[in-house]
Amino acid sequence: MNKENELQNYLSISPDKFGIYLFDTKNLTNLYKEEIILNNDTNYQNHDELKKFLDDNIFKIEKLSGKFIENIFLILEDKKIFNLEIGIKKKNYNISVTKEYLENSLVEAKDLFRESYHNQEIIHMIVNKYFINGKMLLLFEENLKCENFALEVNFKSISNDIIYDLNKILENYQIKISKYLDGSYVKKNFKNDIELSEMS
């Protein structure tokens, strides 16, 4: 891993707080952390407030890291994050279920979602359960003999309009969003910064 990839930048946006972080993935330490609590009168989608927060912190992070921020992971907590569970049931014509068969099934699920929700960008695709011949499994086991295969998948997505607005703001700093993360999902499933950096 080169030095440039050892540093990850995160921007967190929620109804009550903005946060920006610089994380060293090699030494597993947070090098910079700045958060601002938004008062009840502040609309967290107020772009002027977000721009001011970025103005106050981007240069400090760049000075600390010795390089420009080009990419950032965006952690978004918003009621507008769309959640959808879908199930896919398939007849398996092979002797057993392979990893490749699973991957193809997940691609099919993703395609189904995109066909139905054109204005949404998938940020998380979570497999909740697998069913092999009607038996539920929480973890995928390869090469099990199987005639009937089913998946229960949870999609988390945000609208392309929100993506467009956030990209426009960050373009002013020549920063691209590398990945979007659902803040509620992150809080629920990742105990610390190390686990989060491994996910991203």
Language-model features, listed with the residues they occupy:
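Nucleotide/phosphate-binding catalytic cleft detector across ATP-hydrolyzing
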Residues: 1-17, 21, 25-71, 76-200
